[in-house]
Amino acid sequence: MNFRRGLHRIGSLLSTILFALAFASAAMARHKERTLDEIKTEAIKRAENGMYPLIGLDPADVREAFASIKTTDKDEWAAAFMAVADRYMAEATSLEKSDPAKANADYIRAWRIYSFGRWPVPASPGKQRAYANAIEAFRAHARFWDPPLEIVRIPFEGSEIVGYLRLPKNAPGPVPLVLAISGLDSRKEDLSENFSAILPYGIGFFAVDGPGTGQAPIKVSPTADRMFSRVLDYLQTRPEVDKGRIAVHGVSWGAYWGTKLAIAERARLKAVSVQSPPVHLFFQKEYMLNSMFGNREYLFDHAPAFMSIIEGVNSLDDMVARFPELSLVQQQLLAKPSAPMLIVAGALDTQVPISDAYLLLSNGDVPKEAWINPQGGHLGRQVKVWPDPVIFRQVIIPWLVRKLGVEAGGKEARM
């Protein structure tokens, strides 16, 4: 009997594996990845229209790099973009004393080109070099900032959390602060550039790479939010920070962590804003396999990028097995009390289902605010109508300013 039971179990396991493989193959057949020529055409279009992930890139620089790329080899891709960026980096270095404004502009240009050279994740030696160069170029650019950018290193589980802290100039006392968390393929450098816009309101920011991305010390797991709890511990030690007025902002995958923190750390958070937060359906096998392969909203390599950031995942089968445990429904978190939240999303999002935003809105103990673009895609973005920078400056920053009790012009609001 035991032998028969064993055979039955083996047969059931094989059936499950075959079904999963068949499902994945069918999904990949239905949603083919872009060819190299299609990637080039779409990337140039996005550069011309200020669309992610080519916001701020000169189309001429992109075309120059593409002229040297003949295959989808990751190192070839990185080398082509580094060759273009290196020229701006060298010019910037030579101009720092004689023409600092031009040098700074060149550093920005080099940083953005290097960053696209490592995009979406530094999954090869060449892309790792491009990422290292991007960090170097960004920090060279940040040297021109006033108030300055502080590179913070927080000891954490035998390693360190690297973050960027920037505080308003000449603040009369402790200031409110936003903990900004990157997404799957964005980085703390991008967040730091964007969140500079909040400084005039008298609000500081601390930008950090999410688990599995950038310089983060750990990968994604159901307990990886402990990394951000450690950041909050650190911020509590800074006399320049108002401990009672700390908010969180998370973008896409960073919005997942923002949502978890709104619940797990609600006692230490004044408010949390999230853009396109993955909550539950996103983590289910059927949705994952249908949305990640050949997703036209994502430029390329969506599934490989995800597989690279999750702890214990080395294959598609691993990801299918591990993804469901990240669901906030499975973790029994959604019904719990949370900090006040703003949920930003697009009804036409093909990367994170809009139903996850609605699920988050309809759970918890306090009313949540939402900005849903019925014509918007991921993060609520809509080409030429609601591009990323406009959503950030017209929707997210005003909400954070209001929730942190600050009036326009950086004056304290009377609450």
Regions found by a protein language model. Name each.
Residues 386-415:
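Catalytic active-site module of serine/aspartate enzymes centered on a nucleophile-bearing elbow/loop
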Residues 219-240:
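Alpha/beta-hydrolase active-site loop
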Residues 289-333:
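Mobile cap/lid helix-loop segments that gate and shape the active-site cleft of serine hydrolases
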Residues 364-380:
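Catalytic histidine neighborhood in serine/cysteine hydrolases
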Residues 339, 353-362:
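Short alpha-helix in the alpha/beta-hydrolase fold that links the catalytic acid
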